[in-house]
């Protein structure tokens, strides 16, 4: 993580490891703090694949990190039971991947380790589009760029502004729970305790 933090070409760091049950083991948060607070990058951290509180997780919990839980996109759009509670935001946690033990099959696999890089990918897409639009040919948030992730023609964007846009673009789904799906219904009362700001949504970011 520190190597990525100190690499000027890196914009976003995504990590999907941590102690089982979100036991607050110290260490990684020191490195992610350097990356975000000192080097002005963004960090997405996977919540545990359990209902444990993401806020105590060393990867997903620090205030400078974006803690990611999972939801069932293209399913019932509800909260996955086996992903952390009290995250910052939630993303689709299911991927359709080739089998590892044959050459012609596919399977679905799930976890916050998929939801987290998916969120990082959305952030990267947003950054690249802004750089293209405002003629910014650089990358990273080095001191030469004033600590800005985007520094173009009369236009700058910081890591805090990108994070705010991601938060504001999120949405809460309507109640449509399938009790056989392995999810839990997102409560209309304090849904933030289950999904944080909501479900990450690229299409909502563009107008912001």
Give the ranges of each region predicted by the language model:
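Short acidic/His/Gly/Ser-rich catalytic and metal-binding motifs that mark active-site loops
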Residues: 22, 97-100, 175
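Short Gly/charged-rich anion-binding patches and loops
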Residues: 30-31, 54, 84, 161, ...
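Residues that line or immediately flank small-molecule/substrate-binding pockets and catalytic motifs
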Residues: 17, 72, 169
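Extracellular protease catalytic domains of secreted zymogens
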Residues: 46, 68-70, 80, 85, ...
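Loop/turn elements at helix/coil->beta-strand transitions in domains of secreted/extracellular proteins
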Residues: 7-13, 37-43, 62-67, 87, ...
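Extracellular S/T/G-rich loop segment that most often corresponds to the catalytic His/Ser-adjacent loop
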Residues: 57-132, 204
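Substrate-binding/access-modulating region of protease and related hydrolase catalytic domains
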Residues: 1-62, 75-77, 102-118, 191-193
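C-terminal subdomain of the subtilisin-like protease fold in secreted/lumenal serine endopeptidases
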Residues: 2, 10-14, 128-208
């Amino acid at each position: 993580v520190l190597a990525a933090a100190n690499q000027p070409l890196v914009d976003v760091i995504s990590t999907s490891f941590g102690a089982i049950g979100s036991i607050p083991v110290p260490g990684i948060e020191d490195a992610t703090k350097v990356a975000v607070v000192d080097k002005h990058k963004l960090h997405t951290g996977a919540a545990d694949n359990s209902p444990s509180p993401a806020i105590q997780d060393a990867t997903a919990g620090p205030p400078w990190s974006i803690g990611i839980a999972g939801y069932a996109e293209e399913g019932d759009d509800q909260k996955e039971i086996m992903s952390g509670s009290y995250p910052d935001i939630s993303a689709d946690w299911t991927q359709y991947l080739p089998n590892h033990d044959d050459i012609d099959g596919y399977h679905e696999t799930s976890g916050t380790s998929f939801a987290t890089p998916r969120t990082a990918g959305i952030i990267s897409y947003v950054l690249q589009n802004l750089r293209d639009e405002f003629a910014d040919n650089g990358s990273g948030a080095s001191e030469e760029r004033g600590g800005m992730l985007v520094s173009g023609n009369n236009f700058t964007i910081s890591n805090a502004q990108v994070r705010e846009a991601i938060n504001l673009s999120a949405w809460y789904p309507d109640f449509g729970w399938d009790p056989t799906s392995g999810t839990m219904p997102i409560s209309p009362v304090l849904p933030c305790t289950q999904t944080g700001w909501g479900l990450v949504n690229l299409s909502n970011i563009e107008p912001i």
